[in-house]
């Protein structure tokens, strides 16, 4: 992993302890933030499109942003939850660009860390567990503002704890796209820096010092899709994120599409 830690900009939206008795059952949840769980006792399941994940005590679980999933709980179940939002103004999204393990066993440090995170962020507990009560535009904006209004010392300590928890998953994470060619890496960096602008394929070919046809073939070989498809998909993802997390009318979200 060659990314700089300066590229990782994480904000805490919610953190707390949840106690359920067969009432943690929600369907077709999909959010612009990442969910991290530490299971204390009991069992439950998270149902993904490609299968079901059993939640076990003393294990950590990570649910990536924009991943459609459902929850199923038929008995007593206690867990800590942490909702993390990766600042979309960052040049790149590490949580977005990497595949993380869904489940890892907990060590001796994770529980004290997440308990401390709850202790210094008491106002970030969820009033109720129903995702529709907190996974909406006004609530997300309030939570982001609340995060930024905390004391500086709490921000520093909280960020350090979140980094330690995410680091456990980063250890076995793999990039969604493994790019080995430096020319394509430069192009991807340029696309991310200019995602809100109109991106011209000819200019990308010039950055790679290749002819347009050669560039398109090499890009598809390295990334697995054409430059045009990649750029437009990234623009759609960014637009969806802004729509959900910013109080901006749809007509004002003008993200130019790529041009051949």
Write out the residue ranges for each language-model feature:
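Generic protein-terminus/edge-of-domain signal
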Residues: 1-59, 66-69, 73-76, 91, ...
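C-terminal/domain-terminus segments
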Residues: 173, 178-191
């Amino acid at each position: 992993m060659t990314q700089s830690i300066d590229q990782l900009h994480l904000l805490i939206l919610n953190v707390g302890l949840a106690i359920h008795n067969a009432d943690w059952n929600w369907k077709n949840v999909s959010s612009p933030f990442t969910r991290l769980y530490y299971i204390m006792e009991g069992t439950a399941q998270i149902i993904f499109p490609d299968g079901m994940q059993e939640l076990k005590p003393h294990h950590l679980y990570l649910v990536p942003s924009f991943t459609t999933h459902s929850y199923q709980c038929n008995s007593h179940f206690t867990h800590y939850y942490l909702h993390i939002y990766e600042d979309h103004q960052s040049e790149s999204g590490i949580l977005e660009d990497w595949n993380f393990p869904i489940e890892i066993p907990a060590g001796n440090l994770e529980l004290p860390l997440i308990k401390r995170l709850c202790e210094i962020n008491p106002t970030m507990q969820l009033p109720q567990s129903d995702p529709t009560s907190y996974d909406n535009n006004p609530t997300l904006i309030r939570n982001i503002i609340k995060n930024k209004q905390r004391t500086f010392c709490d921000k520093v300590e909280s960020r350090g704890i979140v980094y330690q928890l995410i680091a456990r998953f980063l250890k076995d994470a793999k990039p969604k796209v493994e790019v080995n060619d430096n020319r394509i890496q430069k192009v991807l960096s340029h696309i991310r820096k200019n995602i809100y602008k109109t991106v011209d394929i000819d200019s990308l070919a010039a950055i790679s010092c290749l002819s347009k046809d050669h560039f398109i073939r090499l890009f598809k070989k390295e990334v697995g899709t054409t430059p045009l498809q990649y750029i437009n998909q990234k623009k759609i993802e960014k637009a969806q994120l802004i729509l959900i997390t910013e109080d901006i009318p749809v007509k004002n979200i003008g993200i130019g599409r790529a041009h051949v």
